[in-house]
Amino acid sequence: MSLFPVIVVFGLSFPPIFFELLLSLAIFWLVRRVLLPTGIYDFVWHPALFNTALYCCLFYLISRLFV
């Protein structure tokens, strides 16, 4: 159960997990932008799978912070 209530914006209700998803997406973009110039993607076998796993890990960490 999250600490945040359901938020209503212009008649649309958003569950608290929606904002956790957006926050983890923003952090994912920042981390990916930092990792691209380092050349780490040259060692990654499947970049799309790596990006998905990275996003899932970030979402897990963010969601653990708000529980």
UniProtKB/Swiss-Prot annotation:
Signal peptide: none annotated. Keywords: Cell membrane, Membrane, Transmembrane, Transmembrane helix. Induction: Positively coregulated with aaeA and aaeB by AaeR. It comes from the Bacteria. It is a multi-pass membrane protein. It holds the Pfam family DUF1656. It is found in: Cell membrane. GO terms for cellular component: plasma membrane. The chain crosses the membrane at residues 3-23, 43-63. HAMAP family: AaeX (MF_01546). Belongs to the AaeX family. NCBIfam families: PRK11594.1. This is Protein AaeX. It comes from Escherichia coli O1:K1 / APEC.
